[in-house]
């Protein structure tokens, strides 16, 4: 098996660049993000393709502008035929999505992601049954177990791929999408 770089994408709602120490902030304490930035690639000139949630996620996962990816506003699913980075990666990669999806049915693995844990269920909104999002079974399970939904990536979670949990050298790509608290 060819060794490739492991990829981790972290989405957080309403995250401004100037709230992180790696960009000069010295009063908001984010020790884990600081540590990650010290051992990772930190972008100096990154731009969001669209400031709205769904189109921004579509842009990041596909590499396309919103008008090319499909979702141009919230509550528009990513077209089934639209490929994401998970579908372009070599087969050696293990791919995972954890957290908010907002690009269609949150309940099922799709677009090349092999491991899938969603904290929300927007399917009823996408098919017009409701205007309010509901919480996924996974979200409700986390709450019942005493976790907050944003703890889906903690090391003690049983559904994490073993390669991520044990930090083995296999090739993996993880998207972690967190909600605003």
Show which residues each predicted segment covers:
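Formylglycine-dependent sulfatase
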Residues: 1-181
